[in-house]
Swiss-Prot record:
Miscellaneous comment as given in the Swiss-Prot or TrEMBL entry: The exact nature of the substrate is currently not known. This entry has been annotated based on its similarity to Actinobacteria.
Similarity comment text for this entry: Belongs to the CofC family.
SUPFAM superfamilies the UniProt entry points to: Nucleotide-diphospho-sugar transferases
Reactions catalysed: phosphoenolpyruvate + GTP + H(+) = enolpyruvoyl-2-diphospho-5'-guanosine + diphosphate
Pathway connected to this protein: Cofactor biosynthesis; coenzyme F420 biosynthesis
Keywords: GTP-binding, Nucleotide-binding, Nucleotidyltransferase, Transferase
Pfam families per UniProt: CofC
The protein, known as: Phosphoenolpyruvate guanylyltransferase
Annotated PANTHER family: 2-PHOSPHO-L-LACTATE GUANYLYLTRANSFERASE
Underlying gene: fbiD
List of residues binding phosphoenolpyruvate: 138, 154, 157
């Protein structure tokens, strides 16, 4: 079974890099919109994956899960992403999950095809890293369970995950698509996002 895990910060803390560009209410609404898009995409992808899958939201915000059918909530008791994901990994492995796919909750253009590519890449690899547009952060991470790979989300996390996988003797690879790599981390990207949603009836699938 595949476990798609979507970690989300407290809404008022999310997208802090945009604090000078958006007021708190607009920033929070932006985050909710992106989270809902990621959840919808993950739910649609489940029917296309080669093995059964479940979706978990790891967050101190339970309403995000209760508002979304088919989403299971894992409370984030750690208040630190890597610790929260480590705890989530233990819990979903106990539930029978064999493949864990961590998907950032703030990917506005992620598609079903992106998740299929991530799943397919795990056929021949123990670890698959999908970096952000700078090649530094990790927007998605796939791994087989059980796994000793420590989570290292943060600065240069893509490189960290690849180096650590190699040190542990794990087969690892990168995948990258424009929609999976797109990350709203500055004003230019924010304007690109607004231009796209203004010209599209729906996000790309």
């Amino acid at each position: 079974m595949i476990g798609i895990v979507i970690p989300i910060k407290r809404l008022h803390l999310a997208k802090s890099r945009l604090i000078d560009l958006l007021d708190p209410a607009d920033r929070q609404q932006l985050v909710v919109t992106m989270v809902r898009h990621v959840i919808t995409t993950a739910r649609q992808a489940v029917s296309y994956l080669s093995i059964p899958a479940r979706i978990w939201l790891v967050s101190p915000e339970p309403t995000l899960a209760t508002d979304s059918e088919g989403i299971e909530w894992l409370p984030d008791n750690q208040e630190e992403l890597n610790a929260a994901l480590t705890e989530a990994r233990q819990r979903i492995q106990a539930a029978g999950v064999q493949i864990m796919m961590v998907l950032a909750g703030d990917l506005p253009f992620v598609t079903v095809r992106d998740l299929i590519l991530l799943s397919e890449a795990l056929t021949d690899n123990d670890v698959v890293v999908a970096p952000d547009q700078h090649g530094q952060g990790t927007n998605a991470l796939g791994l087989h369970l059980p796994s000793q790979l420590p989570f290292g989300f943060g600065p240069d996390s893509a490189g960290y995950h690849l180096r650590t996988a190699a040190r542990l003797g794990l087969r690892a690879s990168l995948i990258s698509t424009p929609t999976l790599a797109f990350d709203l981390d500055d004003g230019e990207r924010l304007q690109q996002y607004y231009r796209c949603i203004a010209s599209c009836d729906n996000f790309a699938r």
